[in-house]
């Protein structure tokens, strides 16, 4: 697909506000990268004096296919560098415009909402045309956007207490349509095997995440001293780990777990409850695979393999068999798509991680 260039006729973005300017026939390179629940960008190179190159200016938009199956997406131009009669263009998907809209917090306490209910009740400063949907029906106490001022982007997934932080779903964007899903992608009956269709992979182990203990603490209000104090729980020991010395990871318990809880340092009331909360938080932290990771990153770039995977999408799952006979399922966590050639340049699979939840006393 030859990329198209547009300008907007309104500060309130919508598909109807996009005014078509022409085709970038002088485009020599156009690559779209999308990462799971993260950045969504397009980089392009255009010959300076080619058709519509004069329309390649910041805050105009490039429309291009991001992968073999999705509709063309709009990307806002935010940087243009001219060198040797070539324009190097950097853009970001219109989803990033969510960070330019503030949510006015008007509530005095957190609201119990499902993701769709929460979005419906937001009070945004600027009108917008994002259409939100979700198949997640669980309800949780949500502060962001209700008791805490934040941007729309922070509310969706850019901060602690966001929908992504609370519900752990996966986003799929189709221009202004936002889908927040329990799980995105399909399980594919496809195997990547060392020595067969994997030519290389990278395994990284770091002592920074190899520890012996996790020590969680919480900050709560003391009714006796009339001030916030910190209560620490006994460290959880992780055994069968590779740490040969005592190596402690200090973990602050998220405020949302102890919100509204008070203690009395004179009588001791509330202390055991808070310590138990710290212990549970430490267990969840360890079980969440944030520690002791051995990462095996696989990047698929061989054309023959990419041909087999052309109809795959971000978050699809495949089976990987490595040289040490380890077999595991892994999600596609990043796609790099050549819009001009209409094929993937690279697919990156998620890391395999050592699970520490089985090693906790």
Regions from the language model: what does each represent?
Residues 1-26, 35, 207, 347-361:
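Trimeric viral appendage architectures of receptor-binding fibers, tailspike depolymerases
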Residues 2, 6-10, 76-98, 134-223, ...:
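Short beta-strand-centered interaction patches in the first periplasmic/extracellular domains
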Residues 13-60, 66:
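N-terminal ordered "arm"
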Residues 29-31, 37-40, 119-149:
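N-terminal export/assembly leaders
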Residues 32-44, 282-299:
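Short, basic/aromatic beta-hairpin or loop at an interaction surface
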Residues 51-136:
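Surface-exposed cap/loop segments at beta↔alpha junctions
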Residues 61-74, 221, 320-329:
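Ser/Thr/Gly-rich low-complexity blocks that favor extended beta-strand/coil architectures
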Residues 89-91, 224-272, 276, 293-361:
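Acidic, low-complexity/disordered segments
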């Amino acid at each position: 697909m030859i990329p198209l260039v547009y300008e907007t006729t309104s500060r309130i973005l919508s598909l109807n506000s996009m005014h078509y300017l022409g085709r970038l026939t002088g485009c020599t390179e156009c690559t779209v990268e999308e990462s799971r629940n993260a950045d969504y960008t397009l980089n392009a190179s255009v010959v300076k004096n080619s058709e519509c190159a004069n329309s390649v200016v910041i805050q105009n938009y490039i429309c291009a296919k991001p992968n073999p199956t999705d509709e063309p997406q709009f990307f806002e131009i935010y940087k243009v560098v001219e060198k040797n009669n070539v324009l190097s263009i950097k853009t970001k998907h219109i989803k990033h415009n969510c960070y330019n809209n503030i949510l006015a917090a008007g509530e005095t306490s957190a609201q119990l909402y499902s993701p769709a209910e929460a979005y419906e009740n937001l009070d945004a400063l600027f009108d917008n045309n994002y259409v939100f949907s979700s198949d997640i029906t669980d309800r949780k106490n949500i502060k962001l956007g209700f008791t805490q001022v934040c941007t729309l982007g922070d509310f969706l997934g850019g901060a602690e207490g966001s929908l992504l932080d609370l519900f752990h779903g996966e986003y799929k964007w189709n221009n202004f349509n936002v889908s927040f899903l329990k799980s995105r992608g399909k399980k594919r009956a496809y195997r990547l095997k060392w020595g067969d269709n994997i030519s290389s992979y990278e395994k990284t182990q770091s002592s920074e995440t190899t520890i012996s203990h996790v020590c969680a603490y919480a900050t709560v209000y003391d009714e006796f001293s009339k001030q916030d104090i910190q209560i620490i729980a006994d460290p959880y020991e992780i055994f069968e780990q590779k740490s040969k010395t005592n190596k402690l990871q200090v973990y602050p318990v998220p405020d949302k777990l102890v919100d509204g809880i008070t203690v009395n340092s004179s009588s001791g009331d509330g202390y055991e409850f808070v310590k138990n909360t710290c212990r549970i938080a430490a267990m969840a932290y360890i079980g969440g695979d944030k520690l002791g990771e051995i990462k095996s990153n696989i990047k698929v770039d061989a054309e023959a393999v990419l041909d087999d995977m052309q109809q795959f999408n971000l978050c699809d799952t495949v089976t990987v068999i490595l040289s040490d006979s380890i077999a595991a399922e892994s999600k596609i966590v990043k796609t790099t798509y050549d819009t001009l050639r209409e094929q993937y340049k690279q697919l990156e699979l998620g890391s395999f991680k050592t699970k520490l939840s089985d090693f906790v006393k």
